[in-house]
């Protein structure tokens, strides 16, 4: 077997990232903070249950920050249900509990389902913590199940690239 194609280092890297991701993404206090939204314009359609923010959209909630060209929030009475952000790229960051380093991510589209707490980074997706990096065309993070999937495991079409810096685990 060609040592450059040996599956164990890739499997180990994916396992390490999967094990560290729930800790990296868990932000216990952010969901209880108020949401602040700034944009060039907003269109609220109560009949459809959507709010569409366009132009230099900035959303902040606790340590969470989302920057996008366009954000569509789908909601039921009084409660957001789903957030779809798009940009070139759309960006987010959040500060994990017990950490000084932000988790950051970029993708052409970010989709967050509030009920299931699933975040999907779609199109040139990248997830970072410190110098560790996770790249694929699609990354799915399920906060409830504490599972990260990328590439084929996340119904993506490209391979996954994981970079883990030594001495950070």
Predicted regions and their residues:
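Mature-chain termini and adjacent capping regions
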Residues: 1-169
